[in-house]
């Protein structure tokens, strides 16, 4: 006797390099955006970088280069470079969203974001947003 309130149907995303985008609305700095390698890597390596939101497009590109895992995104050991152009656009857009909704959002994360080979973009596989108490 299952009590089903709905179902979700979505495509199975192909494997990609996992990164994380996150945010915290900090009491001192205001809305901040975080970027790093995602999935289990963020838990094990904690290789992330933060900026105050909103970031510029140039700062979004810098964030990609700031992490130790930047070489993975650049392509290493025979792997093709990942789509860092679309990734920088995603960091920028995420940062703008966090800034624009800072009165509503306490914290958020998109993890994993699957980044594909250069020219093939990315997909958000999982995300959560925690709203501020009213």
Per-range role (PLM):
Residues 1-134:
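ATP-dependent carboxylate/acyl-activation modules
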């Amino acid at each position: 006797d299952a009590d089903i309130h709905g179902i979700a149907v979505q495509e199975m995303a192909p494997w990609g390099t996992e990164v994380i985008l996150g945010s915290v609305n900090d009491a001192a700095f205001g809305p901040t955006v975080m970027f790093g390698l995602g999935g289990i890597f963020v838990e094990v390596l904690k290789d992330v970088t933060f900026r105050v939101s909103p970031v510029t497009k140039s700062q979004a590109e810098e964030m990609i280069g700031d992490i130790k895992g930047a070489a993975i995104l650049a392509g290493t050991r025979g792997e093709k470079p990942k789509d860092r152009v679309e990734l920088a656009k995603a960091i920028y857009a995420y940062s703008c969203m966090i800034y624009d909704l800072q009165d509503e959002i306490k914290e958020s994360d998109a993890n994993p974001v699957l980044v594909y080979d250069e020219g093939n973009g990315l997909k958000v596989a999982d995300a959560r947003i925690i709203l501020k108490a009213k």
